[in-house]
Amino acid sequence: MSLNVLFVASEAVPLAKTGGLGDMVGACAGALQRAGLHVTVMLPGYPAAQAQLRDARVACALPDLPGGPARVLLGAMPDTGVPVLLLDAPALFDRPGNPYLDACGEPYADNALRFAAFSHAAAHVAGGVPDLPAFDIVQAHDWHAALVPLLVKRAGRPVKTVLTVHNLAFQGNFPPRIAQDLGLPPEAVREAGFFGQFSFLKAGLMWADRITTVSRTYAREILTDAFGYGMQDVLRARRHDLVAILNGIDNAVWNPSKDAYLSRPFFAGNLSGKHAAKLQLQTLLRLPKDAHAPLLALGSRLTHQKMADVALQALPQMLEAHPDLQVAVLGCGERRYESAMAALAERHPRRMAAVIGYTERNAHMLHAGADLLLHGSRFEPCGLTPLYAMRYGTVPVASRVGGLVDTIADRGSPEAALRGATGFLFDGETPEAMAGAVARALRVFVQPRAWRVLQYNGMTTDFGWSQPASEYLALYATLAPRATPMPHLQHWPMRTLARPASPPDTAPVGKPARRRRTTALSTTARAHPVARAAGREKIRA
């Protein structure tokens, strides 16, 4: 038989998305399905998800869940056909707002109950439901599904579990007194205690058979006091079970040569369509149409993690120091940062525009039309936004943390001479460091041939899902060795992006970037000791 894998997550594109978690779950499931695995995604039954579910029918009833009876619906993704299970529990998931926050931006008061019920349902489904066989492996994503490994083991199911940590800062910590309403054994509540609270995430870290995270550098960082968010001791104890697999992006969705949101397609060998996209973006944002003005984009959540506070101090410095600079902000997050960004744009109406909110159309137009992407972050598990930007020839200026270290080759580093620079990294959390990195980038921007090499290197680097999918396959094989892999997996071709022989108009400017893909298998001179086996990297102390 082939492997049967159940993804359990709070979001997955296209059914539900608030950020990178949704992108990863949907795209990774599709990639594994193309690799020949039987992958099923289980999500809460949000109304929008149910409306998009294809060929929906009732798979089973669950009368005894915490929070009341519910049904499990079985259907398929509308785009990839990946099987989907939705927990149909209207009292828990039929609400205004997003999956986690109410219409006022506050966490739902019963989030513990909502996601405990979801985890109980997933643990039941793991044993098999009508029309679906029992699963070999259950992969839970972030704290919302982190109770699943505990509940699977408590039920005695012969299923291996993986917990993928997308962001260690989000832990699902709640008062232990509510645990009795969540259907959890008292001893588990005690063992997963976390500074006087019960932690969903800690429970997952303790009971999962393997723990994965989404970049090599972040996997090492979370073992330290600086980035461990209180979980570092648990992670150090499980370090031999910690695996780093870099996230990919969906090259079919993020494809400038076939992007329906753009007026003209473009590719690495011909950027005329990108010039058109810049004018299109300037028109949308009511900025002066100027093909020569450097256009800096900020397209991330407006939060403390993403250094929105630092950007608010650095942007006025940049606008003053660089009279031609234009700034485009697309994002949402904490209300104070949203208001401050909007106010800053109002003070510079012909230099800066801020669109508070997020749509896929605007995100595609931003990455296609901008020249540079500013991506500050105090910590960054992976960092998908710069990968989207590089795919569209937009050069990232980013913090030197987490997955950004693994995916952006800093033009100022010795390593860039070997693997081809793709952007600019800065250290620290000060406005001066951020503004200085942008200034460094702008000095290269006025050198068209050198800038073109940066764009070319980024656009021709393959950050698709082929390599990460192969690493997940290797991980699953170690967990379920008795499951027979499908024969064609050994010969599954790695997808690569088409690229011209050399960057147009840049042949004299040094050597074109060597083809690379920075993954969990990459090593650098600064890398900690690692053990690599079967296409994956285990993080050791």
Curated annotation (Swiss-Prot):
Keywords associated with the record: Glycogen biosynthesis, Glycosyltransferase, Plasmid, Transferase
Presence of the UniProt keyword Lipid metabolism in the record: no
Region (Disordered): 497-541
Pfam annotation, one family: Glyco_transf_5
Pathway(s) this gene product operates in, as recorded in its UniProt entry: Glycan biosynthesis; glycogen biosynthesis
InterPro entries from the UniProt entry: Glyco_trans_1, GS/SS, Starch_synth_cat_dom
Binding of ADP-alpha-D-glucose, residues: K17
Any one Gene Ontology molecular-function term assigned to this protein's record: alpha-1,4-glucan glucosyltransferase (UDP-glucose donor) activity
Catalytic activity, EC: 2.4.1.21
Record field: catalytic activity: [(1->4)-alpha-D-glucosyl](n) + ADP-alpha-D-glucose = [(1->4)-alpha-D-glucosyl](n+1) + ADP + H(+)
UniProt record, GO biological process: glycogen biosynthetic process
Family of this protein: Belongs to the glycosyltransferase 1 family. Bacterial/plant glycogen synthase subfamily.
Role this protein plays: Synthesizes alpha-1,4-glucan chains using ADP-glucose.
UniProt-recorded name of the protein: Glycogen synthase
Organism ancestry: Bacteria, Pseudomonadati, Pseudomonadota, Betaproteobacteria, Burkholderiales
